[in-house]
């Protein structure tokens, strides 16, 4: 994975952790979604983003998020190196296989 993408991923994870610690779960998910987009091509980073989404779901008692993240974690372990739905934010509220637009400020990192 490109160093710029890895650095941007690490920044998003750090911001998500800070938001989680502050109880700002909406902001936490925002940064986790961005980390997910950046980390999709790395099995470890992709799965870790889903793991953190799962943890936020547990913290919020959001059963839809919890149940949706389990198969996404498994799929990320199996398919990250083969195919990913580019731009997909990784949340349980969006279809797992849906290709989505990449945010403008991240697009240059992934091209």
Language-model features: where?
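Solenoid-repeat scaffolds in large eukaryotic assemblies
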Residues: 25-28, 35, 65-66
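TPR/TPR-like (Sel1-like) alpha-helical repeat modules
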Residues: 54-79
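Short coil/turn linker motifs that delimit alpha-helical repeat modules in TPR/alpha-solenoid proteins
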Residues: 4, 24, 41-42
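Alpha-helical junction/boundary sensor with strong preference for TPR arrays
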Residues: 38-39, 77-81
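Inward-facing hydrophobic residues that define packing positions of alpha-helical scaffold repeats
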Residues: 20, 32-33, 39, 70
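Start-of-helix signal in alpha-solenoid helical-repeat scaffolds, especially tetratricopeptide repeats
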Residues: 2, 6-10, 47
